[in-house]
Amino acid sequence: MSITLHLPTVLAKLADAQVLEAQGTTVGEAVAEVATRFPNLAPRLRASDGKPYPFVTFYLNDEDIRFQGGFDAPLSDGDELTVVPAIAGG
């Protein structure tokens, strides 16, 4: 499946683009495919074991993937996946 991946500005710098095309049948496959193409971005998207970080939220068509099966959430052609890293501070 071909999807669109939206990156926040802080991560877009690592891929030289804020919007990327990605391939995969699940969110995890699409994230892995992007991580392979952009090695500098990879450690910001997922842990070295391929699992999602608790402080990076992914939204599939504006819905939190944690309520859709996480990285196992299925994808359809044309889906939009948005990456939102947590912001700390005070």
Task: Walk through the language-model features, giving the residues of each.
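Ubiquitin-like/PB1-type beta-grasp interaction modules and other compact soluble beta-rich domains
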Residues: 1-89
